[in-house]
Amino acid sequence: MYSPSSSNYIKDPISTEIIKSKTRNLKKRAEEAILYRSIAEQSSRKLAEISEAYKHKLADMENYLKIKDRETEIIRKNANESLIKDFLPVIDSMDAAIQAEKDNNLIRIRDQMLSILSKYGLQPIKAEGEKFDPYLHEAIGMTQDGEDGKIKYEVQRGYTLNNSVLRTSKVIVVKR
């Protein structure tokens, strides 16, 4: 029997060759493991880069869709603007006829028309008794009777469409 610590240890050439072969195999596997680890680390970094780029592209797409949704909503709200503008002279004529005759049927028809148009964003601009606002009102005359800077009479009603001025109110303003 032999032991490696004994002085009469004899090297067996077959055992030595097996040990050398196994050592070479272990070194080769260690080198392969290092190579595979390097490949895995590179792949992991590349995956992280691609993932980050994907997140940025996804955020860009979401922002683009939000912008397009807002633009579509604005277009939808204002799509009827020219049609509604064409109705304003008809409403003006009804208002003039109501002033001349106080016809209750005509008042109901005008109110019904305004109610329908309000569903599409049309709102009358308040004028009489209000402080003059050049963004909402157009002064077509002046009077000295009343409080300075206030609107005395509304000659033609103005309207907003979805909070944008469609037509300014034509008014008589008190100026002292």
From Swiss-Prot:
InterPro entries: GrpE, GrpE_coiled_coil, GrpE_head. GO terms for cellular component: cytoplasm. Belongs to the GrpE family. It comes from the Archaea. Its main location: cytoplasm. One of its GO terms (biological process) is protein folding. This is Protein GrpE. The gene is grpE. It is found in: Cytoplasm. Homodimer. Participates actively in the response to hyperosmotic and heat shock by preventing the aggregation of stress-denatured proteins, in association with DnaK and GrpE. It is the nucleotide exchange factor for DnaK and may function as a thermosensor. Unfolded proteins bind initially to DnaJ; upon interaction with the DnaJ-bound protein, DnaK hydrolyzes its bound ATP, resulting in the formation of a stable complex. GrpE releases ADP from DnaK; ATP binding to DnaK triggers the release of the substrate protein, thus completing the reaction cycle. PANTHER family: GRPE PROTEIN (PTHR21237), GRPE PROTEIN HOMOLOG, MITOCHONDRIAL (PTHR21237:SF23). Keywords: Chaperone, Cytoplasm, Stress response. One of its GO terms (molecular function) is protein homodimerization activity.
